[in-house]
Amino acid sequence: MLHFPVLLEESVDFLINDLDGHYVDCTFGRGVHSKLILEKISSKGYLSSFDKDPEAYEFGLNFKNDNFKIRHDSFKNLDKYFKDNSINGIIYDLGTCSTHLDNAKRGFSFNKEGQLDMRFDNTVGEPFSEWLEKAKKEEIIEILYKYGDEKHARLIADAIIEMQKSSPIRTTIQLASLIKDVY
């Protein structure tokens, strides 16, 4: 399933202030924003896109346009690629998208069985299941509350810690079931 951003037209129309300008899509994903930006800018305009997800990067390499370049890197490294004041506009569409949730192998889905990974770039860092095994209760609470806006963060953390005593949580369905039981 393709990810369709909310307010796509409006956000791109607001972004483009010079048809000949240089724009940056910091979260390429499946290229929905990038495609529309490329349709709207002139032949003198340019679009640079970033994604640290290897699958998104590979997908972006299929965009055949001389006014476009995708980089397999995090947007936190923008200053490595551009001089000050060389960009007319930047767009971010943060968070997970349907392509992450629909693919059980990515480890984000709570509807499909898969290894509990949850990394945008699975070549960097450790899977979430490994982090969860070592995490302290307060760290789990902070992650759930801060990034998941989870009102039952403390109860879920307690359940995770308790379950980890008998067996590690390795799959998305194990975690989803545990959270469901808390509710």
Regions found by a protein language model. Give the residues of each.
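S-adenosyl-L-methionine-dependent methyltransferase catalytic core, i.e., the SAM/SAH-binding region
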Residues: 1-183
